[in-house]
UniProtKB/Swiss-Prot annotation:
One of its GO terms (biological process) is cellular response to starvation. InterPro entries: Anti-adapter_IraM (IPR014448), PmrD_sf (IPR038679). Keywords: Cytoplasm, Stress response. Belongs to the IraM/RssC family. It is found in: Cytoplasm. It comes from the Bacteria. Inhibits RpoS proteolysis by regulating RssB activity, thereby increasing the stability of the sigma stress factor RpoS during magnesium starvation. It comes from Escherichia coli O7:K1 (strain IAI39 / ExPEC). This is Anti-adapter protein IraM. One of its GO terms (cellular component) is cytoplasm.
Length: 107
């Protein structure tokens, strides 16, 4: 079964991400991984993680729930990454970010 990423929210201080996805139905997944799942990305879940572009990546999925518009709005409003000022300076202002490669291309 293939899943399509609709949107992703990252919490850089803890490395946790939330993605709204479409599979058989619209869902929200809560996970931790070293990869970023941007909107439009298509992947296949497997027991040990996910397959993305014919390569397997480890991923820890904490929860999968049916999509809830109110919950997604709450997650989006509490999003720490990327902060608005970063778009102007192209520099990440999060001193406590644990993500090694910024998915937004910030330095």
């Amino acid at each position: 079964m293939k899943w399509i990423v609709i949107d992703t929210v990252i919490q850089p201080t803890c490395g946790i991400s939330f993605s709204a996805i479409w599979g058989d139905m619209k869902m929200i997944i809560w996970y931790q991984s070293t990869i970023f799942l941007p909107p439009g990305r298509i992947f296949t879940p497997v027991k040990s993680g996910i397959i993305l572009k014919d390569k397997e990546y480890p991923i820890t999925i904490y929860n999968i729930a049916p999509f809830n518009k109110d919950l997604w709005s709450l997650l989006k409003s509490s999003q720490e990454c990327p902060p608005g000022e970063s778009k102007i300076t192209n520099k990440c202002l999060h001193n406590s970010c644990i993500i090694k490669i910024c998915p937004y291309g910030l330095k």
